[in-house]
């Protein structure tokens, strides 16, 4: 399905310190490397701005890493470049990720003055011991100050990241996290369960398992999240995301709804014209790129079956699920003709439900969403 709209993701890989659970493309760097990277990033933005001049950019997300680790002048340069070279819609949602302790009022005001209208704070926990074990370098008090400054700077759309099932966490401490943050009334809360990724310090930590909550407690934490946040006026619209009415993350909804997106910067992925491609993950390779169009030109278009997989796998993350009518419009055949067996089996097991035109995961299905969603992957091209 062709669309003239796209989303833009800008990757800033730099961090003051890498967290023990993090497997993202992020690291500490010298000033010289940061300067060289920002120069190359600007070059890439200008290249794609010319190539995609006819596209309407509906959301921008500056992520990382820790974008707020950069000087405010650096973020200003990035914003000026995108506004000059892309067609940014008037009502575009423009988000920047920030860590508490890496912003001040002046920096936050610069963000607002340059068109950034949404900020996402990576808090993870309000508990000192939990923050320390995660390798976070901020305190809850620093977060409160950063949050207050963001409001003073004029941010009317704030997200706070929280994490459950972390080392040393209890049901009581997690409930305390939820209530403390909900009382601050940010417009959006992302509540993720910790995943131990290979290659991280957590993965190598032999003592970690005994410090993690039990699987039973992890399930209780997940159920508790929705119950408590509902009390404070938040609605769950995706497996791990909650928002006040009208404040759902438009950028993330775009990913889950198959909106094309351009990713610029180190290791950034893109989905344009039914092609998926990505930039190098090695800094030296990225800085030596001669033509930013090569990855796009060399990428093959996704097959119809791969597009179907993504429609199901991504769309079913949303609590409202997916539309059977939209499936027909996209692919020219019914969802039942392709996935009838999987749908019937999942519904029989109580993992999925159908209401009118829409199919979605049940509460039980969400708890084992990865297993349920994998049923909609083809074993091979058919």
Question: Which stretches of residues belong to each language-model region?
Answer:
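Local cysteine-cluster metal-coordination motifs and their immediate loop/turn environment
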Residues: 13-26
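Short, amphipathic alpha-helical interaction segments positioned at domain boundaries
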Residues: 364-382
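Short active-site neighborhood of thiol/selenol oxidoreductases, capturing the structured segment around
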Residues: 8-11
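Minor-groove-contacting beta-hairpin "wing" of winged helix-turn-helix DNA-binding domains
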Residues: 358-362
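C-terminal scaffold of the Radical SAM
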Residues: 3-5, 26-50, 56-333, 381
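A short, conserved structural fragment
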Residues: 348-357
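Short amphipathic alpha-helical interaction segments
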Residues: 333-345
